[in-house]
Amino acid sequence: DVAPSRGLGDVYKRQDEYFEKVQDSNLMQNKEGGTYRPTFYCLRDNKTSLLWMVPLSSRVEKFKAIHDKQVAKYGKCLTIVLGEFDGKEAAFLLQNMFPIREYYLDHIHTRNNNPVPVKHSIHREVTTRMKKIRQLHSRGKKVVFPDIDRLEQIMLAEVKDNATE
């Protein structure tokens, strides 16, 4: 059900317009100190055509500590995947994932004008965990910080409005 958006491992920046539109204080801000951050790993939901954005963080030590605490307590950590992106360690923050329309994507993350892919093993892990998180969420478990039901409804309403225009 969840597949890469335009190819395996596409990573994007998000437009400020999305943040202004949805007004969710639990979404990660777009800019830190004037630079484009965070970057988002992008997966398409084939049922709705919406994209699910998973923020990447370079603050690996911070999220490794949270990850390790979850593993010690529960035997696993569903919401943070530790891995590599663009030659650097990164934390994929499923706890901060959210739905978006392709319209709100700003630009793809590139190196030397080529899209930077996410390793297939990380893609598999993120995809598997995202499915589990969405299943837990559908059963009423609060697993992610943003209000993904509200955000999904806003995006689906836009898709519907654009289809009738």
What are these regions (language model features)?
Residues 32-36, 46-84:
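Compact nucleic-acid interaction/catalytic patches
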